[in-house]
C-alpha cells in the first residue's frame, strides 16, 4: 500500500465525515493549494472536533491523559485495509505522539480549577490589602485633605464676605456720587433756565426800546418832513410872487421901450 493511500485511510478514519472527496485515493480537495498532500479544510475540521471533545470531556487533567478515539479500533481498521500489525501500531503510536504534542501545546495556556481558585484567592487577598490601604489613607491623608479643604472653604467664605462688603460699599459710594451729580446737574439746569429767562426778558426789553426809538424817530421824521413841505410851499409861493413881479416889470419896461420907439 502506498503512502498516499495510507494518508487517505487515516484522514477518513479520523474525520468520519463521509466527504465525497475521500471516495477515491488521490482525488484531493479542490479548495487546497496541495491537493494530493493535505487538505487544510479537513484539518481544521479535525482540529475543531478535537477541541470540542477536549472541552466537553475534560480529557487533559492533572490526574492522567485520555484520548478521544479508540486506538485498538484504529489498528483494526488499518489491518483491515492491508496494513500489518506492526505498521498499524507504528501509525497509531505516531498519532498518539502527535496528539500528545498538540494537547501539551493547547494546555500550556490553560489552568486547572485548583489553580484558578488559588489565583482567585490571591486576587481577593490583594483586593483586601488594597481596601485596608485605602482605609488607612482615608484616615490619615484624606483627613488631612478634608481639614485643608475645610480651611480653604472658610477662607473662601471670608473672602466672599469681604468681597460682598466691598461691593456694597462701592455701590453705596456710587449711588451717593450719582445723587450728588444728579442734584448738581439739576441746579445747573435751574441756573441755566433762570439765565435764559433773564436773557429773554432783556431781549424783550431791548425790542421794546428799539420799537419806542423807531416810533419816536418816525414821528420826528414825519414832523420834519411836514415842516420841509410847508417851507417848500411857502418858498413856492414866494418864488411865484417874485416871478410874477419880475414878469410884470419886464412887460412894463418893454411897453415903455415900445412907446418910446413909436
UniProtKB/Swiss-Prot annotation:
Localization per Swiss-Prot or TrEMBL: Mitochondrion inner membrane
Protein name, as recorded: Mitochondrial calcium uniporter regulator 1
Protein purpose: Key regulator of mitochondrial calcium uniporter (mcu) required for calcium entry into mitochondrion.
Regions crossing the membrane: 239-261
One GO CC term, this protein: mitochondrial inner membrane
Keywords assigned: Calcium, Calcium transport, Coiled coil, Ion transport, Membrane, Mitochondrion, Mitochondrion inner membrane, Transmembrane, Transmembrane helix, Transport
Organism the protein comes from: Xenopus tropicalis
Membrane topology: Single-pass membrane protein
Family in the record: Belongs to the CCDC90 family.
Amino acid at each position: 500500500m502506498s503512502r498516499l493511500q495510507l494518508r487517505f485511510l487515516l484522514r477518513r478514519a479520523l474525520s468520519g465525515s463521509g466527504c465525497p472527496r475521500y471516495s477515491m485515493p488521490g482525488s484531493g480537495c479542490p479548495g487546497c493549494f496541495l491537493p494530493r498532500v493535505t487538505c487544510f479544510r479537513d484539518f481544521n475540521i479535525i482540529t475543531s472536533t478535537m477541541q470540542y471533545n477536549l472541552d466537553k470531556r475534560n480529557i487533559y487533567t492533572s490526574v492522567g491523559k485520555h484520548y478521544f478515539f479508540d486506538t485498538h479500533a484504529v489498528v483494526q481498521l488499518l489491518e483491515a485495509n492491508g496494513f500489518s500489525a506492526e505498521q498499524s501500531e507504528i501509525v497509531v503510536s505516531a498519532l498518539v505522539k502527535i496528539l500528545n504534542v498538540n494537547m501539551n501545546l493547547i494546555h500550556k495556556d490553560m489552568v486547572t480549577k485548583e489553580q484558578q481558585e488559588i489565583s482567585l484567592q490571591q486576587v481577593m487577598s490583594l483586593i483586601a490589602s488594597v481596601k485596608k490601604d485605602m482605609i488607612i489613607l482615608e484616615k490619615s491623608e484624606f483627613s488631612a485633605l478634608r481639614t485643608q479643604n475645610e480651611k480653604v472653604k472658610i477662607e473662601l467664605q471670608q473672602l466672599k464676605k469681604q468681597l460682598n462688603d466691598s461691593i456694597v460699599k462701592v455701590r453705596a459710594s456710587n449711588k451717593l456720587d450719582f445723587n450728588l451729580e444728579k442734584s448738581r446737574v439739576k441746579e445747573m439746569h435751574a441756573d441755566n433756565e433762570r439765565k435764559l429767562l433773564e436773557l429773554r426778558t432783556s431781549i424783550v426789553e431791548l425790542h421794546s426800546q428799539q420799537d419806542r426809538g423807531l416810533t419816536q424817530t418816525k414821528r420826528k421824521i414825519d414832523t420834519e418832513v411836514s415842516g420841509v413841505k410847508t417851507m417848500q410851499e411857502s418858498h413856492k409861493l414866494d418864488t411865484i410872487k417874485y416871478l410874477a413881479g419880475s414878469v410884470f416889470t419886464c412887460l412894463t419896461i418893454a411897453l415903455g421901450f415900445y412907446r418910446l420907439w413909436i
